[in-house]
Amino acid sequence: MKAMLCCPGRGRPREFDIEEALASALRVFWSKGYEGASLSDLTEAMGITRPSLYAAFGNKESLFRKALDLYEREKLTYVAEALEAPTAREVAERLLRGAVASHASTSGPRGCLGVISSVACGADAEPIRDEVIKRRASSQEALVARFERAKAEGDLPANIDAHGLTAYLVAIIQGMTVQAGAGASCEALEALVKTSLAMWPSA
């Protein structure tokens, strides 16, 4: 999608592709986090001026929210697909392997944008942190519901706490994404996947 935006006093309007600019902003946020990404970093990567950024995306917070939407569409589709797996163990396996494929890829920044941004500590970043936590909570609620269904179907032991199992799995995934961001190899992350699955409760 093309957007024609005019910077006052700059002559002819400058044409740029909004989706390409947003993808560039996503890479900056993913690499540096919300607080670490300056407006100069963003405009340079996007190839636009600050007035063009404000006109197309609003402020930095609004730009990040749009980038987070793009990140979820492009990098987190495996989450919804995993919930459709026939067994709870397969749900866990698809989530774990999906996290490795998404966050340890050599084709883009490593680590998880949500994890990076949820630990932002400045007051200005509080709305962003709250937004990331809210989105994560929605995904976790869906996972709890899936594990409750697995218990009802006899796929998980009746004494398993679905909330606790979800928290355990999320903690493993978040730990893996942090390690991926720190440069852990796919082989090392795969070993974590295998260990986690070996400990998975069986009915």
How should these model regions be labeled?
Residues 69-75:
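Short, basic, alpha-helical segments at the C-terminal edge of helix-turn-helix-like DNA-binding modules
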Residues 2, 110-116, 158-179, 191-199:
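Hydrophobic alpha-helical segments that form the core
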Residues 1-16, 159-160:
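N-terminal intrinsically disordered/low-complexity leader segments
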Residues 102-105, 149, 169-186, 199-203:
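Amphipathic C-terminal alpha-helical segment
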Residues 76, 126-153, 164, 191-194:
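Amphipathic alpha-helical packing segments from all-alpha helical-bundle domains
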Residues 91-92, 106-129:
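Amphipathic alpha-helical segments used for helix-helix packing
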Residues 9, 20, 24, 28-62, ...:
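Helix-turn-helix
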Residues 66, 79-110, 162-169:
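Hydrophobic alpha-helical connector segments
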